[in-house]
Amino acid sequence: RYTFEVLKRITSKNPQVEFHFIFDRPFSKKFIFSSNITPHILTPAARHPILWYIWFELQLPKLLKKINPDIFFSPDGFISTKSKYNSIATIHDINFEHRPQDLPWLHSLYYRNFFQKYARRANHIITVSKFCKEDIANRYDINQQKISVVYNGVSNTFREVDEGKK
């Protein structure tokens, strides 16, 4: 939901800017919010740590070289450590650092190995709370000036529940 809401607003508020949305599989046209978006499908579908590596470290740098973006924005924290483009990564939290046992072994290993690299490589990091900002900064030895807190918003589709329905 975060990605949908943020990108819908950014693209509609900036019609003069060209956006490239990069998908790892066929996508719904509902994700192409406006005419200033060019969609790309980059394979393989990144649904496993080995495929994440192929997608972000091998395939994505090739596509970014063709697109030549001013900024690469990652709403889920994953970026390419091999790409030289400016990047902004949203790292929602780093719970996998504190509770690695809560994830499948290979997922946990990937996150704990790469997210520190992503955080250091990103030009800027967005996170969802002051606690997460301090956690990322302290755990990864990142200057807090590099991290902005952007609280989660609420979609216009959410409505107050009638007292009788609670």
Q: For each of these PLM feature ranges, what is it?
A:
Residues R1-K166:
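Carbohydrate transferase catalytic cores enriched for Leloir-type hexosyltransferases
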